[in-house]
Amino acid sequence: MAPKKKEDKDAPPPEDTNPYGVFVSVTMPSATVVLDVQDDAAAQRETHITLNIPGCHVPWASAHTAPSEGGVYQYSVVKHFRRSGGQDGLLQLINGVLTVTVNDSATNAVLASATVDQLQGFAIGQNTWSTEGLDLVPAAEVPEGVPKARSARLAFASIALQERPLPEGADAAALAAAPPPPEAELPPLLPYSYVSGEAAEKGNMVELVVSGLSPLPPNLQAAADAAGGKLHVTVGLALPGGGPAVAVSLAVAGGRVAAPAFRRELLPPGCLQALQYALEDGLPVVLEVARYVSAEGMADPAFEGYHAAAAAPALAAGLGAAGATEAAAEGLSLTAWAASGAKTCLPPYTAPAGKPKPVEAEVPPAGTCLWEKAGAQLAVSLRFARPVVPAWRPPPPPPRPLLELIPPRDLTPKPPPTTAVDEFKAKVRVIARALAEEYKAVLPPPDASVAAAAAGGGAEGRHKALIFELNRSGKYAQMRDSLKTAVVSLVREKYRKSGSMSPNEMALLYNDLYGSLLAAVHSSLNDLVDAAAARPRAPPPAPVPDKQRLGELLELAAQAEAMGDTDRAELLHQRRLLAKNDAQVWYEYGTYCLRRGGAKRGRAEECFREALALEPAHRGALLALLGCSVAAGRNTDPAYLESAEAAAHRLLDVAGRSSLDAWAALAVVYRAYGEAKRAELASCEQEMARLEKQQLAAAAAAASAGVSPSPSYGEGRAGGNGGGVPATEPSTASAGSVAGSAGELQARSFISLANTLLESLALPAEAALALELAAGLRHWPSVGPDTRTLHALAGALAEQALARAAGGGAASAAAEAMLTPGSSVLSMMRADAGEAVSSVAAEAAWRCRLLVAQLHKARGATDEAIRFYQSFIAITQQHAPSTPPPPPPPPPPPPPPPPQEYIEAARSSGRLAEVPLSAWLELAEAYAARGQARFAADVFLLGASARPGCAVLWRGAGRCFVGAEELGPADMALSEANVLDPEDPEAWGWLALVALREGRAEDAEKALAFGLRCGLGDPGLLLDIAAEYRAAGQRRAEQRVLQEVAVKLMPESCSARLLLARCLVAQRCGAEAAEAVAAARQLAAHEDDEAAVAELEAELRGMA
């Protein structure tokens, strides 16, 4: 027996013929190959296609095929390459390429080839690729006797990742060992993916390409030769933010590294968010270079000398741009790895066991970088299958733009409609001008002598001649006919149809018509005379209030609203609406309706729509309509959110695409939509981050150049175009922002929007929504303390407003919770106790004192409320500029209680004008509730010194002086209030009361008359006036006042009817008194009332 041949260890393993598993299917039906041949016989040479994909040990070859007409080879290639599953199989495929060659079948020489690098799509869930037409590159050299290919082109090529699952219950090992059945008997191949659905949707793939690394250190090639070629240089990259490391191994041969070379790795969805944030924040990208020896028995003592780092900021900058997938960096210098301080991603060097031979005899000193000494430079590129930082997609436009929902109104004045009288007057003017020209034509020349002028009968003769000529020429008839037509039109317009009328009635009609026509003729002739004399008539006064009066009415309305007099505030706003073409007037009335709440919310939206119809670019109205629509969409009908979206897009167009505030408003709208608009919200946040980075860079550049930031740095802060959006204070908007961290400007934009929604528009829930977005920013943990303080203050104010809106015990419960020791409100209030306190913290502490006072008032703790109100006012002196104090109003107050020392200190402060009107009113009300009218008057006077034009403060001071029985100061304060607001009915009423107590009955009568005419409706004040009349014995005047109270103001009050009845009884007016007593009998609700009624009835019977 012949001995068995020794098996060839290098022989490739046989092809895997298992018909079940994962397959890469390649389809190539035909190709057109043009050969460079001289005769037809050579043109019929057979060729075949070979395919080689990662994992193939031997390229697969198709059947030999002869060409058909036109050099078309019908290869009909459909080849299924079985590959292993799992991540190892996927990494093998994506790090390789499909190689296609057209070979000469006789010699197997390569005629043309192509490389298809499309297997990488399998990493992100793509399982098919195809192309119509694939050009192959002809081979430059072929063996002798083999024709060259001039061109080669595949008609079609496709790659598909498929799977044929095992039959249920089948034995995988037995099926793999058995001969494969025919293809027709096998189950069909199904689409397959190496990655899960989530990874296919959100995963990514990274590719690191090393383009070059040169020059090499001098001893590197010698070390590679000593290691027998088993030495390689590895370039690795640890992606910022986490994720797998990417390492490319480069062989060393011929004095250079084998480049370019690449390596691809999978990026799971879990690490992409951190990678995105790292690229957006510009975290450094550091490449690591190291040398490894894999030869057995050899060590590398110079490992640290070849261990280097290369910083690549261009990679981070390029890939940090939105939508970028690839970035390259060239000329990267290498330095010692130990000096870089970066975290290594390549495996550490481990010396082999035993006594290995060093691959390089010379060991460099510690800290030496041989790459740096050689001047080596690295060139790499980094590519992702999908953008790590998503491409910014602008939010889609709203279904209907706002200009379509609210079309702009044409304010061009329209000419008044013409009437028959106007046409008649126009005819008269035309005829008058024509007659004037005729008369002018017959007049003698100016330089004619008296005899010449008297010739022909003089003026009378010329007049007769003119009449004759007008009749002869027919001009008179034309004038008469034209007037006749106008008169007929006038009669038809004015008298319609006369019907059957008597001669007397017709005579009256003719007389009226004649009078009308004569008046029209005189009016027309007078207009002609006035125009000729250049003395036009003065236009009638405009019925619309001017700007100054509109401002005065707005201030008075705000004062009435602060006092709780909503009826008068509504009346004053309605008077301002006489300026119906002023968008700002409609906007301010809409904000008032929003603050009123309830049924007024619908009217507020109508006002904002009217303002936008008048002025489509009114930013305040746009933001107000946005807020109203968001509130309605969240609480009632989500369809309102479409209107809010349209308003937000319009605001973005008006404010400019670089306005952070406008983008913040749009983000609030998308946040109100919820998950339905999550992608749009992310788009807004992405654009805001880009704008912030741009503005911070511009501000930093300006600061480094010693130039103040341009206005665009704070663009969008002010309301503009009609106001309505208050500008953020410099201390809260831009101070420290340049040096601040990322996210600072974005957070400030949301906080500014929240303040506007809260304070100007009374929309606390929507303000809380904006604050949620601020706290949800990615960089919120790193924002500065001032921004956090502003956010906490706005949140506390929103919480307080929501509790007030809830009503009932919610306000008291919220006050208790906010006043808990350690709460954010108390912490902010005490934040100004140190020495180095920022202006923002000081402002917040001052504002929190007022908030704490209001919270104590809400929970019924009057004493505590007074203490913090006084503290709020007192702190104004600590931060006030040194300005001379206003003169204190007379008279000087008596010694105050202990807390009053703060008011005395604040009196000389120039910042008292910043104290809101509500604080003065609430503090005075707290004193009045304790029965300390004199101290309440002091508060009113101090407030009036800070706001000398505020009528309600003077009126409050006068009222408190009346309560303290100081009539002189009361009269002075009330007179000042009356001058500032002559239409305030309560000021007139209190003036009447003071006059009565001082014995000035005539002045009291006039003041009371004016007060009643202006709508005096305070029953208590009127009853006090009636009591003064009673004390003075003026029963008739008392009766008038009591009738006003009993009939108009308190028609359901039994006591008012009884007072009126007693007054009438005192005047012996039995019948009227009986009616009043009868009405009181019907209104009597308890025994005391019935007893009083019975007493009066008995008295009336005694009168009878």
Curated annotation (Swiss-Prot):
Pro residues: compositionally biased ranges: 882-900
Residue numbers spanned by region Disordered: 1-20, 400-419, 706-737, 878-900
UniProt-listed Gene3D superfamilies: Tetratricopeptide repeat domain (1.25.40.10)
Sequence ranges of Gly residues compositional bias: 716-725
Keyword Cytoplasm: yes
Record's GO cellular component terms: axoneme; cilium; outer dynein arm
TPR repeats: 583-618, 846-879, 917-950
Chief site of localization: cytoplasm
Gene inactivation effect: Impaired motility with outer dynein arm defects.
Keywords, sorted A to Z: Cell projection, Cytoplasm, Cytoskeleton, Repeat, TPR repeat
One Gene Ontology term from the biological process aspect of the record: cilium movement
Subcellular localization, as worded in the UniProt entry: Cytoplasm, Cytoskeleton, Cilium axoneme; Cell projection, Cilium
Listed PROSITE patterns: TPR_REGION
Biased composition (Basic and acidic residues): 1-12
InterPro entries assigned to the protein according to its UniProt record, in alphabetical order: CFAP70, TPR-like_helical_dom_sf
Role summary: Axoneme-binding protein that acts as a regulatory component of the outer dynein arm and regulates ciliary motility.
PANTHER family the record matches: CILIA- AND FLAGELLA-ASSOCIATED PROTEIN 70
Stated family: Belongs to the CFAP70 family.
Protein name according to UniProt: Cilia- and flagella-associated protein 70
Organism of origin: Chlamydomonas reinhardtii (Chlamydomonas smithii)
